[in-house]
């Protein structure tokens, strides 16, 4: 089901699935920006509304192999309701030697670095490219975005500055949840959250939409460098 159409089933997600404790698996297509599909088809709200319903597990694959493995896990391993969200379009090239091993998150780069990017889904590839142009930074790739693994939060809590990037609305989404979990850890790290603010996304190419909201590689590199040059 397209992310935008799943919005119409919000009542069923709560009353007919979660409250009944049913085993339901949703493949949420067109999650994130959908480019020329149109303003009403942008899949930017599913992370927020799925975040609000008890009992759901949500995955966000970047690659086809992850999607297949997550679907298998949803069918045969995970209890309860599961959603697997993925974007319109093809897959980026996986990092050399990368294999998904059913872990809820994965760190790429030096985990002892002083800064980190946190992201999921399609934007992982963008963030991975961005750190190639930055120093002293690593990426936390969230494979499961609900519930967020406590170990992922603990890894981020050790750094001095954290940037969370997501192709979804800011309000009620994964980034806000991650920030709340960081606060519970008592971290002193600076936290920056880049996502879609309180607005609708106009029809345009996916690349244009990513640039507009600062979610392309050049914008990420620029934002991190700017924060480095202007410490709080």
Predicted regions and their residues:
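Short, glycine-rich nucleotide/cofactor-binding loops
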Residues: 1-4
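Thiamine diphosphate
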Residues: 6-10, 19-47, 52, 67, ...
